[in-house]
Amino acid sequence: MFFVTPAYAEEAPAAATGTDAHAAPAAGEVHTETGVAEGEHARGPFPPFDSTTYASQLLWLVITFSVFYLLMQKVIAPRIGAILDQRHTRISQDLEEAGRLKAEADAAVQTYEGELAAARAKSNAIGSAARDAAKAKAEEDRRAVEASLSEKIKAAEVRIADIKAKAFADVGTIAEETAAAVVEQLIGGTAAQADVAAAVAAAKKEA
């Protein structure tokens, strides 16, 4: 706890007043300088729209544009041109390759179609020749069979004729013998062989 004496109390306000008087101008000066700076900053135009900086702005614009133009002309544009040329060359090569492959495919298709047509023609020719050969062989076999049958029929007819002739001859002999036996039984005597044969022959003619 502090005790303030009357003498100290009188001196203290004077000292404080002197100190404040000495310090106030400094604070005022700082305040005044700060106020002036802040006022100027608040009242000044937007820097890009400040006419006093147009020259520097135009200069930097020209410099920036020139640098950008040089960059485009020397670096970016050549790279883009090289890329476009490379793409154009690649596309041209791809188109040429596609055309070559298409031509090869068309040639292969034509060759295949030609070979297929030749194979069909050959197959048709072989089939036709086989049919003609089979038809000729069948005709030849038919003629051979017909000739063989004709010969067999002729031989059979000759044989049948011989059998008929022999049978008729045997029938005549049997008839003559039978007639002679009948006459012998009827008249009690033998008839002449010539008469019996003549009678049998006459009977054959009448039959």
Curated annotation (Swiss-Prot):
Superkingdom assignment: Bacteria
UniProt xrefs under PANTHER family: ATP SYNTHASE SUBUNIT B, ATP SYNTHASE SUBUNIT B', CHLOROPLASTIC
Similarity comment: family membership: Belongs to the ATPase B chain family.
GO molecular function, one term: proton-transporting ATPase activity, rotational mechanism
Protein name: ATP synthase subunit b 2
Subunit: F-type ATPases have 2 components, F(1) - the catalytic core - and F(0) - the membrane proton channel. F(1) has five subunits: alpha(3), beta(3), gamma(1), delta(1), epsilon(1). F(0) has three main subunits: a(1), b(2) and c(10-14). The alpha and beta chains form an alternating ring which encloses part of the gamma chain. F(1) is attached to F(0) by a central stalk formed by the gamma and epsilon chains, while a peripheral stalk is formed by the delta and b chains.
Function: F(1)F(0) ATP synthase produces ATP from ADP in the presence of a proton or sodium gradient. F-type ATPases consist of two structural domains, F(1) containing the extramembraneous catalytic core and F(0) containing the membrane proton channel, linked together by a central stalk and a peripheral stalk. During catalysis, ATP synthesis in the catalytic domain of F(1) is coupled via a rotary mechanism of the central stalk subunits to proton translocation.
Segments passing through the bilayer: 53-72
Keyword line: ATP synthesis, Cell inner membrane, Cell membrane, CF(0), Hydrogen ion transport, Ion transport, Membrane, Transmembrane, Transmembrane helix, Transport
Coiled coil region boundaries: none
Classification via CDD domains: ATP-synt_Fo_b
InterPro entries assigned to the protein according to its UniProt record, in alphabetical order: ATP_synth_b/b'su_bac/chlpt (IPR002146), ATP_synthase_B_chain (IPR050059)
UniProt cross-references to Pfam families, sorted A to Z: ATP-synt_B
Protein topology in the membrane: Single-pass membrane protein
Compartments, as annotated in UniProt: Cell inner membrane
GO-annotated cellular components: plasma membrane; proton-transporting ATP synthase complex
